[in-house]
């Protein structure tokens, strides 16, 4: 494989020295970019875009072509590819987000679910990873990703997005045996899926536990964290002669960082409700930290964006082990110039904290 020209993202995750704080952005290939909207229109719809390796590659690279400051690319895909490959029948309803034609509601439903083979059942994702790695040609590392078992389970049990997770939590408390069976099958599926991405060329992976923060502290430990630990334990950790770092991101998980730091991931993602300085004091000896600017800051003027970047950099302090990111994904209404101001500010203002 081609040598990396810019490896500061991987170095920061491994707590090795860097010249400036690396930066990337969740949903950096997305609807705020006019070029993304044009490619999506060409594809026809969101899933057609995900399932076309050439177009998925095109949108993955668009933010890198626009913003030379970006230190990583992230695979363009969706967390719900796994349940779709399990036969749940994913589709997107305008204005309502993702929906499933089949809903999981019993142990019998769960026992009937297959564990997808990454190359046979999710080959379009593996092909996209290979295509992106080839086209990147060592420019920056490529991040692969998956949803966490708990997060995927909520969609499968609810039949789509949910505000209160009523059905998922009812199963969790009323029929924990069924929920554990589903989570165990999903942990196997995610492990296999991420290992497929790593073999295809992903140089780091992130587990998105988007709905872990909806759980009580006890339920988080039993129904989310334990399954993410199983995944981390089963991942390929060395590939192409390099360590493959793992980032664990539980939105709303700021109270549980100490437990998360024990799972074996190299880094924890933080949402914007955490103070990154306090997080570093709590777990910074054990893990790198990624985050954690409020995505809404990008609606503000460039001077305000710069001030918030400066505040977060100062809160983290000197030294490596910080990957700058938003605390969640960029929203579609953001002016692309404001994203550019954000990336520029991170590199310009962080140099003083290194070296």
Curated annotation (Swiss-Prot):
GO terms for molecular function: uroporphyrinogen decarboxylase activity. The keyword Lyase applies. Catalyzes the decarboxylation of four acetate groups of uroporphyrinogen-III to yield coproporphyrinogen-III. GO terms for biological process: protoporphyrinogen IX biosynthetic process from glutamate. The record marks 78 as: Transition state stabilizer. Homodimer. The keyword Lipid metabolism does not apply. It is an enzyme of class 4 (lyase). It catalyses: uroporphyrinogen III + 4 H(+) = coproporphyrinogen III + 4 CO2. Its EC number is 4.1.1.37. Disulfide bonds: none annotated. One of its GO terms (cellular component) is cytosol. Substrate binds at residues 27-31, 78, 155, 210, 328. It comes from the Bacteria. Belongs to the uroporphyrinogen decarboxylase family. This is Uroporphyrinogen decarboxylase. SUPFAM superfamilies: UROD/MetE-like. CDD domains: URO-D (cd00717). Pathway: Porphyrin-containing compound metabolism; protoporphyrin-IX biosynthesis; coproporphyrinogen-III from 5-aminolevulinate: step 4/4. Signal peptide: none annotated. Keywords: Cytoplasm, Decarboxylase, Lyase, Porphyrin biosynthesis. It is found in: Cytoplasm. Pfam families: URO-D.
């Amino acid at each position: 494989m081609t040598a990396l020209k810019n490896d500061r993202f991987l170095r920061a995750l491994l707590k090795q020295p860097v010249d400036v704080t690396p930066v990337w952005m969740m949903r950096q290939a997305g609807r705020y970019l006019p070029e993304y909207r044009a490619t999506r229109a060409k594809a026809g719809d969101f899933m057609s875009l995900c399932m076309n390796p050439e177009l998925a590659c095109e949108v993955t690279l668009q933010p890198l072509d626009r913003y030379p400051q970006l230190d990583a690319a992230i695979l363009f895909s969706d967390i719900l590819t796994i349940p779709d490959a399990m036969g749940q029948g994913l589709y997107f309803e305008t204005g309502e987000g993702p929906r499933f034609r089949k809903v999981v509601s019993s142990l019998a439903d769960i026992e009937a679910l297959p564990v997808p083979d990454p190359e046979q059942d999710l080959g379009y994702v593996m092909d996209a990873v290979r295509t992106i790695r080839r086209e990147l040609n060592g420019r920056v590392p490529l991040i692969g990703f998956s949803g966490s078992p708990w997060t995927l389970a909520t969609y499968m049990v609810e039949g789509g997005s949910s505000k209160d997770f009523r059905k998922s939590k009812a199963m969790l408390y009323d029929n924990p045996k069924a929920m554990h069976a589903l989570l165990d099958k999903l942990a196997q599926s995610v492990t296999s899926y991420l290992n497929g991405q790593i073999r295809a060329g992903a140089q780091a992976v992130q587990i998105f536990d988007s709905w872990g923060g909806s759980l009580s502290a006890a339920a988080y430990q039993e129904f989310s964290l334990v399954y993410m630990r199983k995944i981390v334990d089963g991942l390929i950790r060395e590939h192409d002669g390099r360590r493959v770092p793992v980032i664990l991101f539980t939105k709303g998980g700021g109270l549980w960082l100490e437990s998360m730091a024990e799972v074996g991931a190299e880094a924890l993602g933080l949402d914007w409700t955490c103070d990154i300085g306090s997080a570093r004091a709590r777990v910074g000896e054990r893990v790198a930290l990624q985050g954690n600017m409020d995505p809404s800051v990008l609606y503000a003027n460039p001077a305000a964006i710069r001030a918030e970047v400066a505040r977060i950099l100062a809160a983290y302090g000197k030294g490596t082990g910080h990957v700058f990111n938003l605390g969640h994904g960029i929203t579609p209404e953001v002016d692309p110039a404001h994203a550019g101001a954000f990336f520029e500010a991170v590199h310009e203002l962080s140099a003083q904290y290194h070296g």
